[in-house]
Amino acid sequence: MEETCYRLTSNATDVIIALAPFPEIVYWGAHLAWFSPQDCHSLTRPVANGRLDVDSPITLMAESGHGLFGAPGLEGHRNGQDASPVFTPVRVEQQGNALTIFCEDVNAGLGLVSELVLTDSGVLKVRHALTNQRAQPWQVDRFAVTLPVPERAGEVMAFHGRWIREFQPHRVALSHDGFVLENRRGRTSHEHFPALIAGTPGFHEQQGDVWGVHLGWSGNHRIKCEAKTDGRRLIQAEALYLPGEMALEEGETLHTPWLYASFSATGLNGMSQQFHRFLRDEIIRFPGDKPRPVHLNTWEGIYFNHDPAYIMQMASRAAELGVERFIIDDGWFKGRND
């Protein structure tokens, strides 16, 4: 590894990753008009008053073995041993805006592969893969993706809800400690949407710097935003494992879910545009330029009165009007009697 600084760039966003001495995102924000690897040292944090002369980095895995007082990105053990791994980079592969970092801790017998991809839309994709390299099982308690956000991200927004009251936003000032979202229902729902946004206080649709994450996982999960006493802030997102649920045998590998992250300097609207473009470019499978069929849904036309003759008459009349997709909807509510 000759280079110690790597850049992922798009029209609106830059991500700078330093490798020496350990992998760390030193910048995630607006596009930098002028930057070279030699400028990486200018992004190093100064030593805070009353702190250690050597900073404890918020690495990609936020290991407690670095002396980071906070929630590490990886928690686990091998029958009480190898509980504080420190991952050292051994190889890096970069293809355009896709970076893969191979790390290991030979003392703990663990290997880690980190994938970071900055898409054309500006959405950053991150995930990790942990491999047990020893004969004894390694118990995984937590395995999270960690992203740093700057001190000016002083407000957090998340979403809650229920049936007919979905996606209700709520905001919390983030001045110290942290904000945690947990879902233990076994699936995603309106009660626990797997996303979180941190931004400058008072951010809204058209204004403010915002950093948002969405965890690509439909089971139990935990997302948190933590403010450290030295001013740094971080977002962590993970699948939530119950006691004893996840143990790696020798040679087995566990992946985190993909974390989809976005930075916008133009408020929530700019973030929405990035995620919308990302969905169209990489998630949606049908041809995006193909006109969508005109459809008719019967629910509010007939509710539970599903008479076959009447429905066929509706379908025939709808076809005459140009309807291309006819949807029979019984609502799935309490009036269903079959």
Task: Describe each region flagged by the PLM.
Residues 1-6, 229-248:
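Short acidic, Pro/Gly- and aromatic-enriched capping/linker segments at domain boundaries
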Residues 4-9, 13-15, 23-226, 242:
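Polysaccharide-binding surfaces and accessory modules of carbohydrate-active proteins
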Residues 12, 75, 84-89, 246-265:
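Short Pro-Gly-centered flexible turn/kink motifs
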Residues 12, 128, 251, 296, ...:
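Conserved, mostly hydrophobic/aromatic
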Residues 226, 231, 301-302:
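Primarily single-stranded nucleic-acid-binding OB-fold modules
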Residues 262-293:
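Terminal connector regions
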Residues 287-338:
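Aromatic-lined carbohydrate-binding/catalytic grooves of carbohydrate-active enzymes
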